[in-house]
Structure formats: C-alpha cells, structure tokens
Amino acid sequence: MFSSESWDQVESNLSARKIVLEVCDTIVMRGGRLAGAGIVGILQKMEEDSTGLIFGKRTVVAMDGGLYEHYPQYKRYLKDAVKEILGLEKSKNVVIEHTKDGSGIGASLLAASNSKYEHDF
C-alpha cells in the first residue's frame, strides 16, 4: 500500500498516467453500466408482475455506497445506461437517489413486508 509520501517517489510519465486514467475510467464505466442494467432488469420484472404499473409513474431507486456518492462519472454512466436501455420516455420516470444506510433500511422494510404477508393482521 502506498502512502501519500510514496507517490512522490514513483516515477511515471504523462503517457503512463493517461493509460492508468483510461483503464480506471473503463472499469468505472463497466461497473456503472452493469448496475444500470441490473436496475432496469428489476424494474422490467416489476413491470411484468404488476401488469404495467411501474413505467407509467415515477419510480425512485435508492442507491447506497461511496462510489455512487463520491464518483460523479459512475453516477453518470449508471444513469446513461438506464436511459439507453429503457429509452428516453420511460427513463424520465425513473429517479435514482443516493441514500445513507440503504442496506439497513432495506432489510428493515423487507422484514416488515414479510411480517405483513406472513400473518393476517
């Protein structure tokens, strides 16, 4: 692992740094596009199961994580993939928002919904 002082001692030229930047951007693009495709897949399944109730209205997708929060290019790649796959019209209703502690909240909601359907209250 490099410390900030170690980076000063690393010799590199501009060409090598540009290549590293391109490789990193390619990896981030792939990750964002895969995440976007995953979101679209889930939304399409929900649309199929609800017989057309999802894409006709506003749908909010909560994203948790530092990459989405702190890396604007990742967020752009993800949203571009959703727009590309769904098309401009359907994607207008899909809103992707950052959330803190999404996994804890999601687990709580899942447990609550499971309890609701598990028992007739």
Short names for language-model regions:
Residues 1-121:
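ATP-binding/phosphotransfer module of carbohydrate and carboxylate kinases, centering on a glycine-rich
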